[in-house]
A protein has these predicted regions:
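Membrane-embedded alpha-helical bundles that constitute the cytochrome b-like, heme-associated redox core
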Residues: 2-302, 311-369
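Membrane interface segments of multi-pass transport proteins and intramembrane proteases
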Residues: 305-306
Length: 369
């Protein structure tokens, strides 16, 4: 009786019409190990598995940022006397320029929102416990870099709101001990926000931050692939779904939905240009930074000018910085998670941080004055 043998493989690819090409590619770009790894990779399956998708959403939106940012650079001029006019040109005369600009702005905000959700979901699932401490550290750094992207990009249109909001943000750095004044002068390139400031922010936004972000992102993704995704404390070990095709299919569907939402927001709620910045004009009433910084500016309003002989604003900045540092170092002080236990102190601290961020942000919009 004749027996059928399994088709031979070339570099992990099925034998067939393109076997020769597959073998040629495998000898020059070995991918069989990667393919074999993906075939056996699993994602933990539990009631919070959907939260893993927010990391992929942030990655997708970062890609959108890169593409739309490059397109905007073709027409944008980083000079105080031409920046606003170049934005008007993009929005009014460049074909689909208004759409590209809206997509860039909306995707930036959605990306930071996705990162916040991703960070807190990892926190409450205690997914930072050993050996995944560096995944948490690199992820936290990515959030900080994303917020820095937002801060540097906000000034580039050179509008009234962006000018005075940036002024508030850079003035805050003066309260940092020792290096504060020097940091402010370095950012501004002058005594006040002017042309050199715009040039420096543009360089930071398009030349300095992108390679740093890409390196940290690469490390973050590499660590996730090497160590895998963490099982929640108390979850059933060994219960998972194949990464390919099950999780990839789910993630692809979510990406399509996110791109659809991004398109709807960009078309029906296009990003406004605003009024041109006038350094000699008074600051408009109710000025505030981007939404992901409003918690900081709003909380400083409730601190008295002097507290125990210290500048109230400086004390507020120190308190926010200390809270951020505690949050950043949670994998190293949460000994309960290392023992596979949850503790109310860690959960309570995370809940307080969320309530603080949400409350201060809402107050900034509901009571701007």
């Amino acid at each position: 009786m004749a027996t059928t043998s399994e088709p031979k493989r070339a570099g992990g690819f099925p034998e067939g019409r393109f076997a020769g090409l597959a073998a040629w590619l495998e000898s020059r770009m070995p991918l069989s190990g990667v393919l074999e790894f993906l075939r056996h990779k699993e994602v933990p399956w539990h009631k919070g598995t959907f939260l893993y998708l927010f990391g992929g959403i942030a990655l997708l939106l970062f890609g959108v940022q890169v593409v739309t940012g490059i397109l905007l650079m073709f027409y944008y001029v980083p000079a105080a006397d031409q920046a606003y006019e170049s934005i008007l040109l993009i929005s009014a005369q460049v074909p689909f320029g208004w759409l590209i600009r809206s997509i860039h702005s909306w995707s930036a905000n959605l990306m930071i929102l996705a990162l916040f959700i991703h960070l807190f979901s990892v926190y409450f699932m205690r997914a930072y416990r050993p050996p995944r401490e560096l995944i948490w550290v690199s992820g936290f750094i990515l959030l900080v870099l994303s917020m820095t992207f937002g801060f540097s990009g906000y000034l580039l249109p050179w509008t009234k709101l962006s000018y005075f909001a940036t002024k508030i943000g850079t003035d805050v750095t003066k309260v940092i001990p020792v290096v504060g004044e020097g940091m402010r002068n370095f950012l501004l390139g002058a005594n006040e926000i002017s042309g050199p400031t715009l040039t420096r922010f543009f360089a930071l936004h398009v030349a300095i931050l992108p390679p740093i972000f890409t390196i940290v992102l690469g490390l973050h993704l590499l660590l996730i692939q090497l160590l895998g995704m963490s099982q929640p404390i108390g979850g059933a070990k060994g219960k998972g779904i194949p990464f390919v095709p099950n999780f990839v299919l789910r993630e692809s569907i979510v990406w399509v939905i996110v791109l659809g939402l991004l398109a709807v927001l960009s078309v029906y709620l296009p990003w406004e240009v605003g009024e041109k910045a006038d350094p000699l004009a008074p600051a408009p009433a109710g000025i505030r930074p981007e939404w992901f910084f409003t918690f900081m500016s709003q909380s400083l309003k409730y601190i008295p000018p002097k507290v125990l002989g210290m500048e109230g604003e400086a004390l507020g900045i120190y308190a926010i910085g200390a809270g951020g540092l505690i949050f950043f170092l949670v994998p190293f002080w949460d000994g309960w998670a290392r023992q596979g236990k949850r503790h109310w102190l860690v959960t309570g601290f995370g809940a307080v941080v969320i309530v603080f961020l949400v409350t201060m942000t809402l107050l900034a919009y509901l009571k701007p004055y």
